[in-house]
Amino acid sequence: MNLAFRFSYFGDRFFGSQMQPDLCTVEGEFIGACRLLRLFDDWREANFATAGRTDRGVHARSQVCSFLTDKPERAIEALNRVLPADIWCTGWAEAPDGFHPRYSAVSRTYRYYFSAPGDAAAMHEAAQEFLGRHDFSAFARAGDRNPERRILASRVFIDGEFAVFEVTGESFLWNMVRCMATMLGRVGRGEAEAGEIARLLTGPVERRVAAAPPEGLILWDIDYGIPFTPLPIDAGSSRHLGDRHRYHVLMAKISAHLAQDHRQPDTPGI
């Protein structure tokens, strides 16, 4: 049976998602879990594939992989028990004939989180420049053979203390979303206007936009037009999520206090 799994991960521990010899990657951990369960012996013969690669430090809410196995029940029941705590499956589907997680995707959605957004309304207005089909050469590495991409939706909204850039497209170039985020961040800080994005999309490429830091990026969703059966998160991953949240809330508070002006008087009695 050709099984598809939707899964999430924190990207900070991995050297990207794509399999690399002697390096810890998301694919390497997933394939290792499949081998441990004897779902297949050779990942190539099992046609193991993912929807696309994410760089080191990039996270995923909805990555997708598929592979052939004659033990589908074992895969569905046990994968979450043997995967590391920072990778967990959230759904599964019996993949239709001809399915490939990369080439069968109808669209992909990414979110980029800005911790100090500035003018979010200006960022949202500038994000509309990305809509439609454009040459994104200025927003990707040099040498991409076909730099044209079609953006289906693009917006910036506020989520608590963060501004979130959410973009949906048929496909994306390497580092494209992070480069788009760089320009929106500049707009939010008043360092650029929406017209500069329009010029980068239509004019000759005189310079390429630098990519924003990877830790703010999440592969948010991939649409295949097929239903996935939800899978419950296992206890280990649930604890890991809670522990990470508590740690970062604590560190945010400590960092805020350490960043205060040292000339302020100490709190009495301490």
UniProtKB/Swiss-Prot annotation:
Belongs to the tRNA pseudouridine synthase TruA family. Keywords: Isomerase, tRNA processing. The keyword tRNA processing applies. It comes from the Archaea. Formation of pseudouridine at positions 38, 39 and 40 in the anticodon stem and loop of transfer RNAs. Substrate binds at residue 110. It catalyses: uridine(38/39/40) in tRNA = pseudouridine(38/39/40) in tRNA. Coiled coil: none annotated. GO terms for biological process: tRNA pseudouridine synthesis. HAMAP family: TruA. This is tRNA pseudouridine synthase A. InterPro entries: PsdUridine_synth_cat_dom_sf, PsdUridine_synth_TruA, PsdUridine_synth_TruA_a/b_dom, PsdUridine_synth_TruA_C, TruA/RsuA/RluB/E/F_N. The active site is at 55 (nucleophile). Its EC number is 5.4.99.12. One of its GO terms (molecular function) is RNA binding. It is an enzyme of class 5 (isomerase). The keyword Heme does not apply. Pfam families: PseudoU_synth_1. PANTHER family: PSEUDOURIDYLATE SYNTHASE, TRNA PSEUDOURIDINE SYNTHASE-LIKE 1. It comes from Methanoculleus marisnigri (strain ATCC 35101 / DSM 1498 / JR1). The lineage of its organism: Archaea, Methanobacteriati, Methanobacteriota, Stenosarchaea group, Methanomicrobia.
